[in-house]
């Protein structure tokens, strides 16, 4: 039995731990048949019909590790936290009004400090640095980036050249950081990307396509490609600079993308989940029309977690078969009503 711990970022500045259990982790890839030499005197036997593959069972959702939401040491600051990441033995969370906080154990957190005064939307750890991206949340004002090597001391935020909007997501791959977002101008929205090899110096924003009212909400790297998504569209790049035309996948809004189990996994409104192995063909794997949006995805230790903003989560071991949405509860069994913003794996 394999178990991973997951750390959820809550809008109301509380924190939750949940564990996801993968019951069937011993599946082996199907081995190709080995041809045998024909016997000279015996007639050939007819081919046997192929046997259907054993269906994959989604991970169990009955092993929840709960904490008391009201514990004073789990209330951090007085502003909303938007994103969290883990790196170099530390958890770092970022949020509204430029605030950041750090913890080495997920329980005891540093006093929140302001790094600039903007909204930090996303953070990642790669290449020896924590790098956070965000903006003002208002049209006509620039997007910003900051970085830290220890999660405590932060560089003065710098603006992204030519980008008057917000950066919503950041990833690292192929030797560079890639951040995506949008630029509002004259009441129109344009999709933009900026890249950096060191997290310090950033390229001028690159526009992707023309105005379609589409924002780029999330970006991931896998199988040699960057893939950015938003508002039901996807675009791809091998170098983070030249991007494909926007492809319509769905009329649902998209909020998060990851690469796991040899495929890209996308989630969004109406609890929708799509997968693709080639970024050409996309298959819908889950949906519940009229329900809350899935806003974050996580892959760790063989388990995939999809998180709803309203406190529900889904689990999968392959990205194809998913458990039914389950509610996060506190240690007394009461449903958690705080709104969630993100999720992070714990070692």
List where the protein language model places each region:
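Generic extreme N-terminus detector
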Residues: 5-6, 24, 78
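Short, low-complexity interaction segments enriched in Ser/Thr/Pro/Gly
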Residues: 2, 28, 39-42, 48-51, ...
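Residue-level hotspots at or immediately adjacent to binding/recognition sites across diverse folds
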Residues: 59-347
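Bacterial Sec-dependent N-terminal signal peptides
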Residues: 14-69
